[in-house]
């Protein structure tokens, strides 16, 4: 069982006294994630700005676990909670989007994807319309090479600013990010703080039309008004995850309060009282049934964090294909 957040802060007494951000022990992650499920963060830290984050990283011993989350759209938190520190970048210090020249935007890692799309529209820059349909933040988009409608984040990135676990600044080029489908090979220890994007000059009416099409498509085929984390699984090569899920008979499948959406069966939803364990068990059950039906191994697109609650674990037959 995880010790209390107060106990962790007491161990670090004095080390964190100069921070300007907010330290909150034993914070329910269900208040942060879009699934509205899961256990607590031992300590949640919300830095004021990059300088404050750097000071925090320099003060916290590297043996203490540390995880970074964005706006919580693609996170599944287990019910036993997340040990150590969870760092959440706030919109106040990391959420700005500004035009820096005719074709470039700089965005903080906590900026919602939609805000970047809106800023690009205002600047008359094409190539960012796909962000209008992604329910997430830029930090997560950089980490997973988020994309939609045939466009990916890597197509717009010039360079990414990040801090390492020692609080030192790094600037990564597009090549340094090592992008592939829904993946970046950049060190998982790096915390992205901002990005420089490159767009293409375009007509605002055309950009707005593309954004409207993205929004219409999303509202038509995705359960946007449900408690969901977005696409659950990555698309396998040569097919779509939802098609394989549907063929395996998993559309509408339920475990406890968790359900594969009837509207789009690659979306898991919390119907009201789902636990993190319900959601993960449902996802693993779907993976097992798809593998049994077609031999295809689905890979999670949603990031799973934390510890199982005492006495809980995934069913043995499911663990064989994790």
Swiss-Prot record:
Which superkingdom does the taxonomy of this entry point to?
Bacteria
The FAD-binding PCMH-type domain, residue ranges: 36-202
Offer a single GO CC term for the protein. Answer: cytosol
Q: Which reaction does it catalyse?
A: UDP-N-acetyl-alpha-D-muramate + NADP(+) = UDP-N-acetyl-3-O-(1-carboxyvinyl)-alpha-D-glucosamine + NADPH + H(+)
Q: Does the keyword Ribosomal protein apply?
A: no
Biological processes, Gene Ontology terms: cell division; cell wall organization; peptidoglycan biosynthetic process; regulation of cell shape
**Would I find Iron-sulfur among this entry's keywords?**
no
Q: Which pathway, metabolic or otherwise, does it act in? A: Cell wall biogenesis; peptidoglycan biosynthesis
Question: Known EC number(s)?
Answer: 1.3.1.98
* Requisite cofactors: FAD
Any GO molecular function: FAD binding
InterPro entries named in the record: FAD-bd_PCMH, FAD-bd_PCMH-like_sf, FAD-bd_PCMH_sub1, FAD-bd_PCMH_sub2, MurB, MurB_C, MurB_C_sf, Oxid_FAD_bind_N
Tell me which residues this entry annotates as catalytic. 182, 231, 301
- SUPFAM superfamilies from the xrefs? FAD-binding/transporter-associated domain-like, Uridine diphospho-N-Acetylenolpyruvylglucosamine reductase, MurB, C-terminal domain
Where does it reside? Cytoplasm
Q: Which family does it belong to?
A: Belongs to the MurB family.
Q: What job does this protein perform?
A: Cell wall formation.
Record protein name field: UDP-N-acetylenolpyruvoylglucosamine reductase
Q: What species is this protein from?
A: Brucella suis (strain ATCC 23445 / NCTC 10510)
- Supply the gene name: murB
């Amino acid at each position: 069982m995880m010790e209390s957040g107060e106990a962790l802060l007491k161990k670090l007494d004095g080390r964190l006294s100069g921070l300007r951000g907010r330290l909150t022990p034993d914070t329910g992650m269900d208040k942060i994630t879009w699934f509205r499920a899961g256990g607590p963060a031992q300590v949640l830290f919300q830095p004021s700005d990059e300088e404050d984050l750097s000071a925090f990283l320099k003060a916290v011993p590297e043996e203490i676990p540390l995880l970074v989350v964005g706006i919580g759209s693609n996170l599944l938190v287990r019910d036993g909670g997340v040990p150590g520190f969870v760092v959440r970048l706030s919109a106040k210090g990391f959420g700005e989007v500004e035009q820096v020249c005719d074709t470039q935007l700089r965005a903080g890692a906590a900026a919602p994807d939609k805000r970047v799309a809106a800023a690009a529209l205002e600047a008359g820059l094409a190539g960012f319309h796909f962000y209008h349909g992604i329910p997430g933040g830029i930090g997560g988009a950089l980490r997973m090479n988020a994309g939609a409608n045939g466009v990916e984040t890597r197509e717009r990135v010039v360079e990414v600013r990040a801090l390492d676990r020692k609080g030192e600044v790094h600037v990564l080029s597009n090549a340094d990010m090592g992008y592939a489908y829904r993946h970046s090979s950049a060190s998982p220890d790096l915390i992205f703080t901002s990005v420089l994007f490159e767009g293409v000059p375009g007509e605002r009416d055309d950009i707005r039309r593309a954004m409207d099409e993205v929004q219409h498509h999303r509202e038509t085929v995705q359960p946007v008004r449900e408690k969901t984390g977005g696409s659950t699984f990555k698309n396998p090569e040569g097919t779509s995850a939802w098609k394989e899920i549907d063929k395996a008979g998993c559309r509408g499948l339920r475990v406890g309060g968790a359900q594969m959406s009837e509207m789009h069966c690659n979306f898991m939803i919390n119907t009201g009282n789902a636990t993190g364990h319900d959601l993960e068990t449902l996802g693993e059950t779907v993976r097992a049934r798809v593998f049994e039906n077609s031999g295809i191994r689905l890979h999670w697109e949603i990031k799973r964090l934390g510890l199982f609650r005492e006495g809980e674990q995934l069913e043995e037959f499911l663990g064989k294909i994790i």
